[in-house]
């Protein structure tokens, strides 16, 4: 059912200091919309600085898709307050626009209404926009406007010293990377618990389908909404941000070198489909190259091993240089019940679950078994709250009730929580007690709660109401950690940094592309 972690938990209880110094960061995406919920057609607000070079406020795929990035932080409450300050500042700078509070967009009539993010005239800025042009031409622009939250997580060196016997990060990079790959394999096996608890996209606006074929047995209500009665996260389904053409890349998570080799192969292997699409239409570039992945970031994954890159370094070269530094969790929908899209209960749960994923035994996985794990995710994504729902064990035919597996997992998480809380606090234990109830009563899950309101008011109605409510709330709250002066200084500095990049270019864009485009 779930791996036996009793020995590892006993070890953890004897080494409570090993968990002091966990580091986290959050990235939150949100669409800028007008007062009636339509996608904002304005450019990235001048008052927010330069998206290319701002430390905390940037854009993702579309010019209207904001992305907020926190610095790395050792304290969850501090981290979330920083994120809230960025939201407060932005809410005051958006004029009559709002931040869409749901993962799935609504009110987008046509793909051509979605303007790609622009980053100025520097080669790197134009490269980023062309990469997005490639995404649009490969997968369609609508899929790229789906928003999520990414949770970045790393364990302290003290943990790896006690757990794996390493002395420092550089000499111990193989052991530390092996530990993080173990986490990733367990995440693929058991991470469906995240959409079960926190999936918040059980429905989509019918406009999102835009005539696309789907085999999903959608129910419709009169408010322009398609939903599955027991779904948790359509964002994570094939309708959302997934990429079928990548499922046969053979990428596995057993060790650093085979992972990086497979990733590098994907950015060097031409795809018949993308060769047919072509590189250019007249003078207009259509994509960076015709390979399976234009760049490594195009790999769709619910979790990624990461290391901060140096100038000019690719993500995989950074991993080879220093090993895995942290993990990026990518399966969180926007939390519609929070004005900042994520809350402390979710962060504490992820801490507990990711620690458990490192402690629990995780046999190596072939690419076939990786595909098997997808069945459990799909079951939870599309009908996770269905009475009597079951979870498959590995690639075998045996199954267990989801409720049983969930409760067994939480029995382990409760012990991790006691270690994290120590004698001073009970906040992690409270999170366990609150969330485990969702296995007895699926109506407590985010997806059940939001679907109830959506059936009454429609997705558009719910989105507009929450967007307006959070706009007023954030506009009226004072900043707590950042100051107006700091935010204005970063706005100006970001513009200056972009300007310097534009002045520094010596190559023409065509020359730059020949060097960095991978064709």
Swiss-Prot record:
<dbReference type="InterPro" id="IPR014746">
    <property type="entry name" value="Gln_synth/guanido_kin_cat_dom"/>
</dbReference>
<dbReference type="GO" id="GO:0046872">
    <property type="term" value="F:metal ion binding"/>
</dbReference>
<dbReference type="GO" id="GO:0004357">
    <property type="term" value="F:glutamate-cysteine ligase activity"/>
</dbReference>
<dbReference type="GO" id="GO:0005829">
    <property type="term" value="C:cytosol"/>
</dbReference>
<protein>
    <recommendedName>
        <fullName>Glutamate--cysteine ligase</fullName>
        <ecNumber>6.3.2.2</ecNumber>
    </recommendedName>
</protein>
<dbReference type="GO" id="GO:0006750">
    <property type="term" value="P:glutathione biosynthetic process"/>
</dbReference>
<keyword id="KW-0436">Ligase</keyword>
<dbReference type="GO" id="GO:0005524">
    <property type="term" value="F:ATP binding"/>
</dbReference>
<dbReference type="Pfam" id="PF04262">
    <property type="entry name" value="Glu_cys_ligase"/>
</dbReference>
<keyword id="KW-0547">Nucleotide-binding</keyword>
<keyword id="KW-0317">Glutathione biosynthesis</keyword>
<dbReference type="InterPro" id="IPR007370">
    <property type="entry name" value="Glu_cys_ligase"/>
</dbReference>
<comment type="pathway">
    <text>Sulfur metabolism; glutathione biosynthesis; glutathione from L-cysteine and L-glutamate: step 1/2.</text>
</comment>
<dbReference type="InterPro" id="IPR006334">
    <property type="entry name" value="Glut_cys_ligase"/>
</dbReference>
<comment type="similarity">
    <text>Belongs to the glutamate--cysteine ligase type 1 family. Type 1 subfamily.</text>
</comment>
<keyword id="KW-0067">ATP-binding</keyword>
């Amino acid at each position: 059912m779930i791996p036996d972690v009793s020995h590892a938990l006993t070890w953890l209880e004897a080494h409570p200091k090993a968990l002091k110094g966990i580091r986290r960061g959050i990235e939150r995406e949100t669409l800028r919309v007008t007062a009636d919920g339509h996608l904002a057609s304005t450019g990235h607000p001048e008052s927010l600085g330069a998206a290319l070079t701002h430390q905390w406020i940037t854009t993702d795929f579309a010019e209207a898709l904001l992305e907020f990035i926190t610095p790395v932080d050792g304290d969850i409450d501090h981290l979330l307050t920083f994120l809230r300050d960025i939201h407060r500042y932005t809410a005051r700078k958006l004029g009559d626009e709002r931040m869409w509070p749901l993962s799935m967009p609504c009110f987008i009539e046509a793909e051509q209404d979605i303007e790609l993010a622009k980053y100025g005239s520097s080669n790197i800025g134009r490269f980023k926009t062309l990469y997005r042009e490639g995404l649009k031409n490969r997968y369609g622009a609508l899929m790229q406007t789906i928003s999520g939250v990414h949770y970045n997580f790393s364990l302290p060196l003290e943990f790896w010293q006690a757990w794996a016997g390493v002395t420092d990060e550089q000499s111990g990079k193989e052991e530390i990377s092996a530990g993080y790959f173990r986490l990733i394999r367990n995440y693929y096996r058991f991470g469906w618990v995240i959409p079960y608890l926190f999936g918040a996209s059980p429905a989509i606006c019918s406009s999102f389908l835009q005539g696309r074929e789907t085999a999903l047995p959608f129910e419709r209500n009169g408010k322009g909404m398609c939903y599955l009665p027991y779904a948790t996260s359509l964002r994570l389904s094939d309708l959302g941000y997934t990429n079928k053409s990548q499922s046969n890349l053979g990428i596995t998570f057993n060790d650093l070198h085979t992972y990086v080799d497979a990733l590098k192969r994907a950015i060097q292997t031409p795809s018949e489909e993308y060769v047919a699409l072509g590189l250019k239409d007249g003078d207009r570039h259509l994509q960076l190259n015709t390979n399976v992945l234009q760049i490594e970031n195009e790999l769709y994954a619910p979790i990624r091993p990461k290391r901060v890159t140096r100038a000019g370094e690719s993500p995989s070269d950074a991993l080879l240089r220093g090993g895995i530094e942290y993990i990026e969790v990518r399966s969180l929908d926007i939390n519609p019940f929070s004005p900042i899209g994520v809350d402390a209960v979710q962060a504490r749960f992820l801490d507990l679950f990711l620690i458990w994923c490192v402690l629990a035994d995780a046999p190596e996985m072939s690419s076939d078994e990786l595909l098997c794990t997808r069945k459990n995710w799909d079951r939870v994504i599309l009908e996770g709250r269905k009475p009597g729902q079951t979870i498959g064990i590995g690639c075998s035919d045996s199954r267990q009730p989801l409720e049983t597996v969930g409760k067994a997992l939480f029995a382990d998480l409760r012990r991790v929580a006691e270690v994290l809380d120590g004698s001073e606090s009970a906040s992690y234990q409270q999170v366990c007690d609150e969330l485990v109830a969702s296995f007895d009563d699926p109506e407590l899950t985010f997806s059940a709660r939001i679907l109830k309101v959506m059936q009454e008011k429609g997705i558009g109605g719910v989105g507009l109401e929450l967007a307006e409510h959070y706009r007023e709330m954030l506009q009226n709250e004072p900043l707590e950690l950042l100051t107006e002066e700091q935010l204005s200084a970063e706005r100006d500095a970001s513009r200056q940094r972009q300007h310097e990049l534009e002045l520094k270019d010596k190559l023409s864009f065509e020359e730059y592309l020949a060097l960095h485009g991978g064709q």
